Design a protein with these regions (language model features):
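Glycine-rich, charged/polar anion/phosphate-binding loops
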Residues: 23-26, 40-41, 89-91, 109-112
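Active-site neighborhoods and metal-handling regions in enzymes and metal-associated proteins
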Residues: 42-45, 62, 150-151
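Double-stranded beta-helix
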Residues: 46-110
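Non-heme Fe(II)/2-oxoglutarate
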Residues: 102-104, 108-172
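Feature marks short, surface-exposed loop/turn motifs that line or immediately flank catalytic pockets
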Residues: 11, 47, 62, 131-133
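Conserved hydrophobic/aromatic beta-strand scaffold that supports enzyme active sites
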Residues: 18, 38-42, 92-94, 102-104, ...
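Conserved double-stranded beta-helix
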Residues: 1-55
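Short, surface-exposed loop/helix-turn segments at secondary-structure junctions
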Residues: 21-24, 77-89, 121, 140-146
Length: 172
């Protein structure tokens, strides 16, 4: 089920994200298992120049790693000494995406991004998925949902149903 989603807007000159695991945060939100994944969908081209996603291939097999807070920031990531050792053993893969491309990755995969050195913003959609057996065991202030079963739709969607939907087109 959809656990969390957001639009990621990376303005020109924006700093990248330190290597981290999503499950490090989701574990603290009451998810016992790392049976979670994220999908990033490119609304703009994601290139090395504008700070595309980069992953350390195979690091999802390391399990949940401790993270440390960055000085003068709300960001956190894997301890620098441990990260240096990990980077000797696992290759960095930069994930360049064309508009409409998507990449799916495990919640324990170490990932981050570089700075946006381009003159243009970069927009992606991020959807994070959980399994129903891993519904958080306790509430959290994050607003991420518990699993709830969905009832199948019994009526066919007709043209007038679509007319009532809001316009979600992006303009910038």
């Amino acid at each position: 089920y959809l656990y969390h989603n957001k639009v990621v807007l990376k303005y020109p000159g924006t700093e990248g994200f330190r290597y981290h695991q999503d499950y490090f945060y989701w574990y603290d939100m009451g998810n016992i298992y790392p049976d979670m994944a994220a999908v990033q969908i490119a609304l703009d081209a994601c290139t090395r120049n504008n700070g595309c996603l980069k992953v350390l291939s195979g690091t999802h097999k390391l399990g949940r790693l401790n993270h440390t807070a960055l000085a003068q920031s709300s960001d956190s990531g894997v301890d620098e000494e441990r990260l240096k050792e990990i980077m000797k053993r696992f290759p960095v893969v930069e994930i360049e995406l064309a508009v409409g491309d998507a990449v799916l990755f495990h919640a324990n995969l170490l990932h981050g991004s570089a700075d946006n050195h381009s003159a243009e913003p970069r927009v992606t959609l991020l959807g994070c998925y959980n399994t129903k057996h891993n519904s958080p065991y306790r509430g959290s202030a994050s607003g991420h949902p518990y699993y709830s079963s969905q009832k199948p739709m019994s009526a066919e969607i007709v043209e007038t149903d679509l007319m009532r939907l809001p316009d979600y087109s992006l303009m910038y």
